[in-house]
Amino acid sequence: VSLGSWRSWEWSDLWRCRGIPGRKVIITPEQFRYIQLFHNMLGVRPKDVVEDKEENRLIFVVEKGDLGRAVGRGGRKLKTMRRLLKGDLDMSIEVVEFDDTPEGFVINLLSPARVPRVRIVKQGDETVAIAYVVEQDKSIAIGKNGRRIKRARILAKRWYDIDNIKIATWTTPTS
């Protein structure tokens, strides 16, 4: 599979990559090719893609409700895509589900960690999301070598202008 194999998409189709009213996400020609490739292979048109060169990965954002269709039962479709692209694209591929609210998006970004609540606050001139994570899932929310929290910070900044995400422990009140 070649990264140059395009379908009949036009640049005008990129309106779908703009999510929040008044918020424009810039898509480069290279990212556009990744979006087309993802769509052609998995049958789901992603909303956005970010190339994280530091972690050597592509992070695709799909519409709410499209995550299951994109990865397939047991992750089968995504595993097939990774296997087919192993020689052409030496990057890991991650998929996250978009949400119309910044709180919901942060919860999705930290998945599979259990996040019962997210608060968006202003701290000085910064916008900070405080994610309350179930104590047992704190390491899951951060991820191996901080990969998951880095991903969350990149995409929260890109889509909602959230400057930082902090993890707090969620404790359930005891009776």
Residue ranges with predicted function:
Residues 6, 10-175:
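RNA-contacting regions in translation and RNA-metabolism proteins
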Residues 2:
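Acidic, glycine-enriched catalytic cores built around paired aspartates
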